[in-house]
Amino acid sequence: MPSTALGEFVGTLVLILLGNGVVAGVLLEKSKANGAGWMVITAGWGFAVLCGVLVAVALGAPGELNPAVMLANVIAGTRTVPDALVHVVAQMAGAIAGATLVWLHYFSHWRETRDQGAILACFSNAPAIRGTVPNLISEIIATMVLVLVGTAIGTTGVAGGRRSSFEALL
């Protein structure tokens, strides 16, 4: 279990470093990617997820990188609660480490950027239109799709019958 937790830590670090890094690059003043737009952010996050999973799996971890995915596996009976807790702690620590690296990397840009909303968006998201119920529904749908697709990729008989998400991605 310790090596798989390390893989989840490093994979999540890579995920957040690249994902939040592309957001910071697009939103912060005087960065080379400033103003590149929403498509660059979404493509960058897609690449970040791929890289995070590849790194985690290469280190022997399942590449789940998200407490919601871990919870789904506990509910499905493929993970024990103690195992899940260790991995969730590793994921959270990896996310904090990745965000810290983004903060350090863009250190001089934080002072140059006057838009507090842009600074906040580098580390969090907010709805375009606030509404508790619609926003909750949006998060539920997004999490369900994440878990559904991630589970489908790693299922026997999908993607050429391969058994792991790492092999399916190849």
Each model region followed by its residue ranges:
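Membrane-interface helix-loop junctions and terminal tails of multi-pass membrane proteins
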Residues: M1-L170
